[in-house]
Amino acid sequence: MSTITVLGAGAMGSAICTPLADAGWDVRLWGTWLDDHLLDAIERGENHPRTNQPFAQGVTLYRSSELDEALEGADTVIVSVASVGVEQVVKMALPGIVKADALMVTSKGFLEFDNGDVLLLPDSIRRIAADEGYDNLPPIIAVGGPVKANECAAREPTATIFGCKDLDVAIKYARAIRTDNYAIEATDDETGVEICAPMKNVFAIALGIADGLQEKTGVPHHNLKAATFNEAVREMSILGTSQGADEMTAFGIPGVGDLEVTGLSGRNKFYGVRIGRGEGPKEALEEMARLEQTVEGVPAAGLALKFVEQHAPELHDQLPLMNAVIDVLSGQVEDVKTRIGQAVLPARP
C-alpha cells in the first residue's frame, strides 16, 4: 500500500481523502495551525464542518506540529491549502516533498513574490524550491476540474483532471487514484489546467452577479449570465494559449466544467450574488470571511491582472470580463449590470 500525505484539512483536503482511501492508499491528513477546530470535529466523530459529510475511514490525522511525522515515508504529497498559504506550507514541507515520487496540487490561484513576480502555482513551487536550495523537486500534478468538495466526500459522481508536464506521470496517478465515483482525465497541459483554476473563480463572481441582479429585481438575467459564461470561457482559452496551453483545455472540464459548477454553487458565485443584490464588495467579503467562507476569486482577480501585465500585456484589452470584475471589486462601479454587460455583450458589427 502506497502512502499519500494531504497538506491542509479544509474542505478539499479532507474531501479528497475519500477517493484516496477508497482507491486503497494509506492516507494521512495534516492540518495547518488554522485547522485545529476541523480536526477536533473529525476526532469527535462529527461530520467535517466544511463539507458536512462524514470523514473517510482509516485516515491518520496529524496536527500542525507533526508535519515531519506526516511526511515521513510518504510516496506522494498533495498540497491542498488556500493559495495564500501555499508558499509557507511548501517551504515547511520541502524536505519531505523532495523525497516523494510526485507532488499534487489542488490549490488554485496565483502567487506573488516579494519582487512582484506573479506566477501560476506549479511554477511558484518550482521557484520556491530553487530559492530554498532544492533542485530535486518531483513531478508536479495540477488537479483541476469541477469538483465540489462536499459531493466528492459524499462519493457522488465526480470528474476531475490531472495535468502534468510528464503525461506518463499524469496517467499513472489517474489510474492509481480513480474510483467508480471519482473519474480522472490525464493531460500534459499543466499550464492550461492551472490557468483555468483561478480564472474560473474570478469569472464565477460575474456569474453570481447576474443571479444577484435577478434576486434584487425579480427579473431573470439568464441572457446576461449566458453571455458572461461564454466570454469567461473565451478569455480562459486565449490567456491559456498565450502561455503555451492547448486552446481546447478551457473548453473541457478544467474550464467549462469547473466554471459551470462554481457558477452554480461555489463561494465565488455566492459572493457575486451579494454584490448583484446591492451589497458593497468590501462588506460582502467581510461577511463571508466571518462565515469562514474563502472567496479566492477576489485576490485572484488582482493577481490575474498583474500576471497578464507581466506575461501577456498584449492581451489586456482582449480580456474585458476580467477587467470588468476588477472594476466591480474596486467598489467604484455604481451600475454593476451595465459594467458587466459592456464586457460580455457582442460589439456592434
Region spans (language model):
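Nucleotide donor/acceptor-binding cores
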Residues: 2-3, 101, 158
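Rossmann-like NAD(P)(H) cofactor-binding subdomain of soluble oxidoreductases
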Residues: 60, 67-72, 76-155, 173-175
